[in-house]
Amino acid sequence: MLTYKAMYKFLDQGVHAEVLDFPGTITSGATLEEARRLLASALVDMAETNLLRGEPLPQPDPSCTDPEADLEEPIHLLLTAASRVRIVPRASAPGNGGTYSDT
């Protein structure tokens, strides 16, 4: 588990939410609860994207702060590993004279 810092700004149009120490993790919601839920989802999406690209996750920085934030709080990133196996028929496997499709 990695613990980052979330910040929220209460605006007339809703709540702006951002993970201060994970660049690009930004969203907004109509309410604080919606913004929290969407920010948690955005954090997972950003982390998975980094990993799929072979990029490291940013290190949490507890010293990150935004003086304009109305609320700052920890946000926890929990990732799980998954395996995916694809069965390729022998005649279609590369090198066996058949055609191969990875779709």
Language-model region placement:
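Short aromatic-glycine-(Arg/Gly/Cys) micro-motifs in beta-strand/loop hairpins
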Residues: M7-D21
